[in-house]
Design a protein with these regions (language model features):
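A glycine-anchored, Pro-Gly-centered beta-turn/N-cap motif
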Residues: 148-158
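Hydrophobic/aromatic beta-strand elements that line small-molecule binding cavities or substrate pockets
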Residues: 143-146, 172
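Generic recognition of long tandem-repeat/solenoid scaffolds
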Residues: 89-91, 128-130, 146
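Residues in well-ordered beta-strands of folded domains
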Residues: 128-130, 156, 173
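Extended, solvent-exposed segments with strong compositional bias
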Residues: 104-141
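C-terminal or internal capping secondary-structure element at the end of a domain, subdomain, or sheet
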Residues: 159-163
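Extracellular and analogous surface-interaction loops
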Residues: 79-82, 145-149
């Protein structure tokens, strides 16, 4: 059974655990040294606004001295699925699909369906996906976590739109020859 993130919408962001304090959400850019500082939500500029400016299915977003991965859109459905040690998928169905697992298996078995978007460097092993409006030090709503091997990942996308399903798959594949 897939576990989907519990979110009021998006965009969603995936950060390495040690970058969480560097994400300010609706409060500011770059997190804060003291999370109890008196900040007004949506007071510009803020990290959430930076996230909302991106207009592609998936994109890197600079956070501190590295990059997070942004999942664009207001659709809150996203699950993480592992395929071995070096590959995982973000699965984004756009409505309830009875046979979603069959679509996931199709995506796993057909790597040529994917188009490369960018490369992402992961230096620590734990990744957290959450609503980009939340500050990293106080994530509201749901979150998803997945362990990943450190290294450079090729990030690619496959949009499957057929009569009974519309699903976007983002594949994170660790480059060989790390």
């Amino acid at each position: 059974m897939l576990k989907f993130i519990d979110s009021g919408g998006g965009p969603l962001i995936m950060l390495e655990r040690d970058l969480l304090p560097c994400w300010g959400g609706i409060f500011n850019i770059g997190g804060v040294a003291n999370p109890h500082r008196n900040r007004v939500p949506f007071e510009a500029p803020n990290d959430y606004d930076r996230a909302c400016e991106i207009r592609s299915w998936i994109a890197p977003l600079h956070v501190s001295n590295r990059a997070g991965v942004l999942f664009w859109g207001d659709d809150p459905y996203l699950a993480l699925v592992r395929q071995g040690d070096a590959t995982f998928f973000a699965v984004r169905p756009y409505y309830e699909i009875e046979n979603l697992q069959d679509h996931i298996e199709f995506a796993k078995e057909n790597p040529n369906c994917f188009t490369k978007d960018f490369e992402a460097s992961i230096s620590s092993s734990q990744l957290i996906v959450f609503d980009s409006a939340s500050p990293g030090w106080d994530i509201r709503g749901g979150r998803l976590e997945i362990d990943a091997l450190p290294g450079i990942y090729e990030v690619s996308t496959y949009w499957q739109k057929i009569p009974d399903a519309e699903v976007v798959f983002h594949k994170f594949n660790l480059r060989q020859g790390r």
